[in-house]
Amino acid sequence: MKRWIGRWLVAVAVLHTGVALALFGNTYRTMWSDGLWGAGVRDAGHSAAAWFLLFGILALAAGLAVSAVERSGARLPRSLGVALLGLAVLGIVLMPVSGFWLVLPPALALLRPARDGTDRAARSAG
């Protein structure tokens, strides 16, 4: 199997950030022109826009870190799969029409036991 979990997370992060820019472009322009200090707490719309963008950046960092671990051949921790699954399930329950569904494949892949006795990272290095 190819290394794909980190790349998947990076792709989701890029997509998430693109959606943020599409949905909140006007809000970001207003935040920029009015000054960034405290811009994320001016109202609920500004807060949502700020969190949407910041979460995309965090997801990108996580995806890049997972990619680095996959390339090194080190084992990806099962706790990452548990955390991603928890995030996906809670996100889907709170917002069924959302991108949280895209977090399920890597979460489940991280939780799936190796069939040949190798760890997940070695198996994905294929």
For every predicted segment, state its role.
Residues 1, 115-126:
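Short, charged juxtamembrane terminal tails flanking transmembrane helices
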Residues 1-14, 80:
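Interfacial segments of alpha-helical transmembrane regions
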Residues 1-4, 40-47, 72, 76, ...:
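Membrane-interfacial loop-to-transmembrane-helix junctions in polytopic alpha-helical membrane proteins
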Residues 11, 55-61, 103-107:
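Hydrophobic cores of alpha-helical transmembrane segments in multi-pass inner/ER membrane proteins
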Residues 14-51:
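Hydrophobic transmembrane helix segments
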Residues 17-27, 63, 67-70, 92-95, ...:
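Transmembrane helix-loop junctions and nearby membrane-interface residues
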Residues 49-90:
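Mid-chain, well-packed structural core segment of small domains
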Residues 82-112:
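Hydrophobic alpha-helical transmembrane segments of integral membrane proteins
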